[in-house]
Amino acid sequence: MENFEQREEQKPIKKKGSVLKSFIGWVVYVALLVGLVVGTPKALSYILKSEYPMAAITSGSMWPTLKTGDMVFIQGIQSRNEFEVGDIVVYKNPQGFTIHRVEEKQKDVVITKGDANNTLDTPVKYEDIIGKTVEFRGKPFKIPLLGNISIILNR
């Protein structure tokens, strides 16, 4: 019994200051996390000149270059001269957005195709193309699996 009593006496008593310090630490941590979640897309939007600076790959149409769940970064496009055949572009369509490779540039439209697809897409008007993927060493810069978070949250 005496041993038990000694243990209880040795328990440190938390001071009000340490609880407050811990609480403030958590508040700062949460504020920084919220700042990153909100601020990163805004900063990327400004840097990349794109309303949509990041995109999650939601299908296998660009396999093996881009896989479902990859996160890619989108550089905004202001004119038809800012991309060429072979670039991967993002364009608006009635279902949302599509990320496919440019196969051909014609006078009024662009012909695209997913790398894993056998057929060409419906021609895309130049004004519907909003950007192209950011490249690093000649390949799309992507973060594997990070896009899965967006895919899950948008279900």
Predicted regions and their residues:
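Short beta-strand-centered aromatic/proline hotspots
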Residues: 57, 88, 98-104
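Short beta-strand segments that buttress and anchor functional surface loops
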Residues: 88-92, 112
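Extended, hydrophilic extramembrane loops/domains of integral membrane proteins
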Residues: 103, 109-147
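Short, charged beta-turn/beta-strand-edge "cap" motif at the junction between a beta-strand
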Residues: 77-82, 94-98
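Protein maturation boundaries and topogenic segments
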Residues: 1-79, 140-155
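Short coil-to-beta-strand transition motifs
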Residues: 92-100, 122-125
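Structural motif
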Residues: 69-71, 84-87
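Hydrophobic beta-strand signal
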Residues: 72-73, 90, 130
